[in-house]
């Protein structure tokens, strides 16, 4: 879908080291730039909830889930 393509582009833009996963820092920098009220701790909490394989990184599938959770935050 068009929405998924936009999310994929956003994911790839945030993935600064092109590892295929997002670190806390990569996700925080990207989200904080758009939503300054989001704290690093907010990002850590979201990653803890969506990081299904517990590697401390956010994969593409985990990113989709994280994005849904971010959309639910009162920003």
Curated annotation (Swiss-Prot):
One Pfam family from the record: EF-hand_7
Tissue: Liver, and to a much lower level intestine.
Binding site for Ca(2+) 1: 15, 17, 19, 21, 26
Positions annotated to bind Ca(2+) 2: 51, 53, 55, 57, 62
GO molecular function, one term: calcium ion binding
Modification type N-acetylserine: residues: 1
Source organism, top-level taxon: Eukaryota
Free-text function comment from the UniProt entry: Binds both calcium and copper, but not zinc. May be involved in calcium signal transduction.
Subunit comment: Monomer and homodimer.
Protein name stated in the entry: Calhepatin
């Amino acid at each position: 879908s068009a929405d998924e393509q936009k999310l994929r582009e956003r994911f790839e833009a945030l993935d600064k080291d092109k590892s295929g996963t997002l670190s806390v820092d990569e996700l925080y920098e990207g989200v904080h730039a758009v939503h300054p009220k989001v704290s690093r701790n907010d990002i850590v909490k979201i990653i803890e909830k969506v990081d299904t394989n517990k590697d401390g990184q956010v994969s593409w599938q985990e990113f989709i889930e994280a994005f849904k959770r971010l959309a639910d935050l009162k920003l």
